[in-house]
């Protein structure tokens, strides 16, 4: 493919494997579309799917997946640790090869229109946002599914596509956007005290005076009896994974808490891992040209 777009739809189902497989199957065996990865989390009750393909070819499988979510996920019955406002909660498009950000925004608008035609309210966010207030996903999703009926009464929060005055009664709303690649990364702690995780997340995230390009929140993992700091690094070239991990480690020491593991959610650029390898291994004068796979792909 000469033109490659990535899309990472997030679905509010992480426990029912039958429904998850129905959703993921929408992206299998499609012309000019490749399913790269999908991962589900029971505590978050969420599934993240990573797909690449020709921009036009991505539309049909995405609409099929929305329809599966519409038929099988009732947000009135949904619970989970991750903020959410819809059955397909977010759908970011990321340009990979031969595609400009302007074209990515146009695709987000086109897909948003198609989803809106299913009587589902659609909010554009990040680079595709229709106003500065909607660039930040956290602001768009504030109130979550339960709070959207009241929120959408405000003229400032009418949907960009689909019904303007309230969410779909079972599906809720969806945010469709255009952005550059980000790293979804979690740090697990050896405590079950959510207050500790919330404090650390507040110190680490940019909005709380922490690291630039980091969004973070504390999450309770009940099945494992621990908590984690769930993070999005929106520009890993400016704030790296190791910087985020080390700040979490530093703040955790205040409470006598240790980092016991980390998790990568979905896919991430190789360069993001190389940064951390250089730091922790103390590699001097390293170049991506020294990575075997990089040279093979040239």
Where are these regions (language model features)?
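Long, contiguous binding/interaction regions
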Residues: 1-298
């Amino acid at each position: 493919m000469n033109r490659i777009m990535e899309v990472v739809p997030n679905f509010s189902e992480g426990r029912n494997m039958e429904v998850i497989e129905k959703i993921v199957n929408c992206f299998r065996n499609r012309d000019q579309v490749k399913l790269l990865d999908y991962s589900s989390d029971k505590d978050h009750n969420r599934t993240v799917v990573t797909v690449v393909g020709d921009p036009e070819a991505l539309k049909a499988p995405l609409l099929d997946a929305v329809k599966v979510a519409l038929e099988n996920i009732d947000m009135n019955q949904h619970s989970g640790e991750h903020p959410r406002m819809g059955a397909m909660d977010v759908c970011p498009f990321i340009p990979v090869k031969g595609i400009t950000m302007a074209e990515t925004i146009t695709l987000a608008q086109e897909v948003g229109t198609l989803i809106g035609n299913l009587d589902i309210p659609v909010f554009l966010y990040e680079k595709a946002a229709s106003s500065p207030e909607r660039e930040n996903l956290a602001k768009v999703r504030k109130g979550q599914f339960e709070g959207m009926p009241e929120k959408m009464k405000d003229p400032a929060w009418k949907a960009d596509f689909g019904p303007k005055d309230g969410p779909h009664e079972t599906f809720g709303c969806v945010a469709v956007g255009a952005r550059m690649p980000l790293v979804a990364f979690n740090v697990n702690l050896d405590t079950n005290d959510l207050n500790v995780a919330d404090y650390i997340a507040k110190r680490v995230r940019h909005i709380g005076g922490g690291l630039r390009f980091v969004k973070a929140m504390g999450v309770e993992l009940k099945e494992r009896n621990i908590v984690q700091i769930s993070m999005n690094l929106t520009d890993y070239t400016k704030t790296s994974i190791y910087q985020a991990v080390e700040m979490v480690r530093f703040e955790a020491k205040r409470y006598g808490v240790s980092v016991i593991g980390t998790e990568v959610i979905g896919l991430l650029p190789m360069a993001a891992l190389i940064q951390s390898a250089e730091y922790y291994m103390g590699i001097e004068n390293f170049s991506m040209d020294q990575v075997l796979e990089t040279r093979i792909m040239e």
